Amino acid sequence: MRFNLAERILNQDVLSKDEALALFEDETIDTFELLNEAYIIRKHFFGKKVKLNMILNAKSGICSEDCGYCGQSVKMKEKQRYALVEPDKIKAGAQVATENHIGTYCIVMSGRGPTNREVDHICETVHDIKVLHPQLKICACLGLTNEEQAEKLKEAGVDRYNHNLNTSERYHNEVVTTHTYEDRVRTVEIMKANHISPCSGVICGMGETNEDIIDMAFALREIDADSIPINFLHPIKGTKFGGLDLLSPMKCLRIIAMFRLINPSKEIRIAGGREVNLRSLQAIALKAANSIFVGDYLITGGQPNELDYQMIEDLGFEIDG
């Protein structure tokens, strides 16, 4: 490529925000050129390995927040509701994850944040899972948390905590009004302070600008998230963003490539909405990303695991772990 981007970045010459935005918006630069540069970086740090992740929706539909993308929002009248599931169901999910060569098992709860009782419930269950499946990484996604809860999660064996920034600081109030951008950043910082690996990502396709997308990538670089899930909006009828169009597959690929160029050494995961937004180009996204969710998401379906395994094999890649 005319800019030798990969060589520059691997030599610690980081992109500036202005330069990244210019690259992202320059229509004379082919998306596949950017992907080729991203692939050189991805291969340098991760080879041809692909990390697999699986979600369990452990508590659904009980939420006070008004997130405009979410089918579990307080504003949604028709939604699946259930309280925190029993430990046996969470443990059964861990068994399925292990049998399917999943490296990270994500336990997700709806709501603004967990009660202390819910945290204790999760901690006891995670402890038991770690005894049975010591090699399985556990990611918790429970909402806004405090120091005491983070300490308990760490002691129980939680390896990673997911709390997405979701969008840029500028656009945040268009997405949700019941908590602040600073609330989200604070939760990530609490996890880092308690030596739990921070996982934080975005949702693209909610009406944000190109500048917002680049701002998101730099914000995640600034908070030093170890893992960055990139979701693409899967519009849900009845939500604020339910009437928006899907992003084009090529726009999605360009976004993923830019996130790799801006966060070169981080785990970048293709997450929710990949099937309906990337469509037939899902495999190409792994030229920049090195991680995917397999199976279903929280309230939307994924594709069969066998298709993901075949996609990885067809690329000449291999499952990490």
Swiss-Prot record:
Binding residues annotated for [2Fe-2S] cluster, in chain numbering: C106, C139, C199, R269
The enzyme's E.C. designation: 2.8.1.6
Coiled coil residues, start to end: none
Summary of subunit composition and partner proteins: Homodimer.
Family annotation (HAMAP family): BioB (MF_01694)
Purpose of the protein: Catalyzes the conversion of dethiobiotin (DTB) to biotin by the insertion of a sulfur atom into dethiobiotin via a radical-based mechanism.
One GO BP annotation of this record: biotin biosynthetic process
Organism, as annotated: Staphylococcus haemolyticus (strain JCSC1435)
Xref: InterPro entries: Aldolase_TIM, BATS_dom, Biotin_synth/BioAB, Biotin_synthase, Elp3/MiaA/NifB-like_rSAM, rSAM
Pathway where it operates: Cofactor biosynthesis; biotin biosynthesis; biotin from 7,8-diaminononanoate: step 2/2
Similarity-based family: Belongs to the radical SAM superfamily. Biotin synthase family.
UniProt-annotated binding residues for [4Fe-4S] cluster: C63, C67, C70
Alphabetized UniProt keyword annotations: 2Fe-2S, 4Fe-4S, Biotin biosynthesis, Iron, Iron-sulfur, Metal-binding, S-adenosyl-L-methionine, Transferase
Metal-binding among keywords: yes
GO-annotated molecular function: 2 iron, 2 sulfur cluster binding; 4 iron, 4 sulfur cluster binding; biotin synthase activity; iron ion binding
Domain Radical SAM core, first and last residues per copy: 45-271
Cofactor(s) needed by this chain: [4Fe-4S] cluster; [2Fe-2S] cluster
High-level lineage: Bacteria, Bacillati, Bacillota, Bacilli, Bacillales
Annotated catalysed reactions: (4R,5S)-dethiobiotin + (sulfur carrier)-SH + 2 reduced [2Fe-2S]-[ferredoxin] + 2 S-adenosyl-L-methionine = (sulfur carrier)-H + biotin + 2 5'-deoxyadenosine + 2 L-methionine + 2 oxidized [2Fe-2S]-[ferredoxin]
Keyword Metal-binding recorded: yes
Descriptive protein name: Biotin synthase
